[in-house]
């Protein structure tokens, strides 16, 4: 009754107005699952390939090739298979593609089908997605890492680092965490406006003021936390996404906004100093994706007390993660479903991390849609942390709102991760 009977893929627009893939998967019993695929602005060199059409249409960014692949070749390969056989279906698509990075059919085609299959199977089973994927133990609501100041590739301003985040670890529930984040977000808006900064928002809903340095951005956030009535380091901690690969040039870190260039060791020391001065409990992509020596230095300096998240470093890839674990590099992986391109491989990356006592952070991309699948996956995998942007833009809020619904549905079973995510 849960055999796949049809796949209908289409081209839709993401939050940046660029085309992306949406897939509907229909089952024999009438169940249907729908998934829309996100896309990134700062992408790692080792990510699975997002297939784009080229040419004039949509300025070369069309995804009709990926849509056609889902509707024809992929459907021909998996049509009639039971949707509950997720691993089998994902492996068939991976083998059908036949490339190491999904460049023939496109990770956007494969992922769209993979997620839609899981959602259709969940509907057929009468279970919410988080319960279908995660089983009876899926009850941990993640601490949101809320990106309230944007820089780097996510904003048109001088700030070198890409994201400055607040983490409401002192909340008791996800609903309270969202409220706390919202209050700090709106307080920050007032503080920036009072100092003459613009309060337009970037791709992920955070503010993109013309600040020049990381300390300047952090000071604004610290003041806003206090003015909102919370205690930095207790109620609310901080996180950074440096996206260092973006400014790693000729073996050095070029901080144009701050007017200086740092060697690898000096960059690691700078980040360790920031983590010591401010209540920063998480640093993502502090070093460039292939600067393994720099990553080792940073891990040795501050890894015992700071979560060091590999995004471009690991690209949700279990093989690269195992390399990092073996080398003692970083202590956490950022999980982006479209970096690897299938649900099965995503879950494998999380399991690999947890077995090695690495944390995992479920994450959106800068190009998002109203699809809230990652909220369910964060709960399904007991990640304990989620990155899904700021407290504005409906493409970001869709995930927070889904987490609130999940918490409500879990009732007394629901647990909020809170301070348990803090290292040391």
From Swiss-Prot:
Chain sites annotated for binding (2R)-2-phosphoglycerate: 162, 336, 365-366, 387
Alphabetic keyword roster: Cytoplasm, Glycolysis, Lyase, Magnesium, Metal-binding, Secreted
Associated pathway: Carbohydrate degradation; glycolysis; pyruvate from D-glyceraldehyde 3-phosphate: step 4/5
Keyword Metal-binding assigned: yes
Positions annotated to bind Mg(2+): 241, 284, 311
Protein task: Catalyzes the reversible conversion of 2-phosphoglycerate (2-PG) into phosphoenolpyruvate (PEP). It is essential for the degradation of carbohydrates via glycolysis.
Protein name: Enolase
């Amino acid at each position: 009754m849960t055999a796949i009977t049809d796949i209908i893929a289409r081209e839709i627009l993401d939050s940046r107005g660029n085309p992306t893939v949406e897939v509907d998967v229909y089952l024999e019993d009438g169940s249907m699952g729908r998934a829309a695929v996100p896309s990134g602005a700062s992408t790692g060199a080792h990510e699975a390939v997002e297939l784009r059409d080229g040419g004039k249409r949509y300025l070369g960014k069309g995804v009709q090739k990926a849509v056609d692949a889902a509707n024809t070749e992929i459907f021909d390969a998996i049509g009639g298979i039971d949707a509950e056989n997720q691993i089998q279906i994902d492996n068939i698509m991976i083998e059908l593609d036949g490339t190491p990075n999904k460049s023939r059919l496109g990770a956007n085609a494969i992922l769209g089908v993979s997620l839609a299959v899981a959602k259709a199977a969940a509907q057929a089973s009468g279970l919410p997605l988080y319960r279908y994927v995660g089983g009876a133990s899926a009850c941990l609501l993640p601490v949101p890492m809320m990106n309230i100041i944007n820089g780097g590739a996510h904003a048109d301003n001088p700030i070198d680092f890409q994201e400055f985040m607040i983490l409401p670890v002192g909340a008791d529930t996800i609903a309270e965490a969202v409220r706390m984040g919202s209050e700090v977000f709106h307080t920050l808006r007032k503080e920036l406006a009072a100092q003459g900064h613009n309060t337009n928002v970037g791709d992920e809903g955070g503010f993109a003021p013309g600040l020049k340095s990381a300390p300047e951005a952090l000071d604004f956030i610290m003041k806003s936390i206090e003015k909102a009535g919370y205690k930095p380091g207790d109620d609310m901690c901080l996180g950074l996404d440096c996206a260092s690969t973006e400014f790693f040039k000729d073996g050095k870190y070029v901080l144009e906004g701050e007017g200086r260039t740092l060697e690898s060791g000096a960059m690691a020391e700078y980040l360790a100093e920031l983590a010591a001065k401010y209540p920063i409990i998480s640093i993502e992509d502090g070093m460039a994706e292939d600067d393994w020596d720099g990553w080792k230095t940073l891990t040795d300096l501050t890894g015992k007390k700071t979560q060091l998240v590999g995004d471009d470093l690991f690209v949700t890839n279990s093989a690269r993660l195992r390399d990092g674990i073996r080398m003692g590099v970083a202590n956490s992986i950022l999980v982006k479903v479209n970096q690897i391109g299938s649900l099965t491989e995503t879950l494998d990356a999380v399991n690999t991390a947890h077995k090695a006592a690495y944390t995992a952070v479920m994450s959106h991309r800068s190009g998002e849609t109203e699809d809230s699948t990652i909220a369910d996956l964060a709960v399904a995998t007991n990640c304990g942390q989620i990155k899904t942007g700021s407290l504005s833009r409906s493409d970001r809020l869709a995930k927070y709102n889904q987490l609130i619904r999940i918490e409500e549905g879990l009732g007394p079973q629901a647990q909020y991760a809170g301070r348990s995510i803090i290292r040391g």
